[in-house]
Design a protein with these regions (language model features):
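Conserved coupling/switch loop of ABC ATPases
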Residues: 131, 149
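A generic "structured core" feature
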Residues: 136, 140-146
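Domain-scale signature associated with acetyltransferase and cell-envelope carbohydrate enzymes
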Residues: 1-87, 96-102, 108-120, 127-129, ...
Length: 186
């Protein structure tokens, strides 16, 4: 873990287990974490500068989760680059008959694919981002959405399963009455 001025909330934690190391989790400058970062089998987690991870949110990686700069992840969001379980009924049954520490319970036995979330995105409360998804810069994922497919930059994604409901949000006018905003954008 690297970076300056990062902050961990009260119930937050970083879990580095099953073949992963501290080098697999990279936290950039000015990051606030109030949820959990979980890495197994060298699963990479990269948080860009000024990223926020909300209360009870979980980033679970066995491959790669990259969250670019200035992205906000609201409370109770799950971002998992794996299924957390195998699909095979017989293997799932076997897992249930083993101890919690048995090797069969590791995420590497489930399907997995990398996740990338671009710059300046907002991931709404209770959303879920599934394996293999890429979300472009400046996107909003609505609360309670389940994202199973990638989305281009500058759009709003909503629903279960999530779909693009608005595009070109980079063309939406910002409020000019916000104190300090006009100085900020110059």
């Amino acid at each position: 873990m690297t970076g300056d001025d990062y902050k961990f909330g009260r119930a937050s934690y970083v879990s580095i287990s099953d073949g992963s190391s501290k080098a697999d989790v990279v936290i950039s400058d000015h990051v606030w974490i109030y949820g959990a970062l979980q890495s197994q089998n060298h699963g990479q987690i990269r948080l860009g500068k000024y990223t926020r991870v909300g209360v009870d949110s979980k980033l679970q990686s066995v491959e790669s989760i990259i969250i670019d700069d200035y992205t906000t992840i609201a409370d109770n969001v799950v971002i998992a680059d794996n299924n957390n379980h195998p699909v095979s009924p017989s293997f799932r049954l076997y897992m249930r008959m083993t101890s919690d520490t048995d090797e069969s319970r590791r995420w590497k036995h489930s399907a997995h694919a990398p996740i990338y979330i671009g710059k300046n995105c907002w991931i709404g409360q209770n959303a879920r981002i599934n394996k293999g998804v890429t979300i472009g810069d400046n996107c909003i994922v609505a609360a309670n959405s389940v994202v199973t497919k990638s989305a281009p930059a500058n759009c709003i994604i909503a629903g279960n399963p999530a779909r693009i409901v608005k595009t070109d949000i980079d063309k939406v006018e910002a409020p000019t009455t916000c104190k300090g905003y006009n100085d900020y954008v110059r």
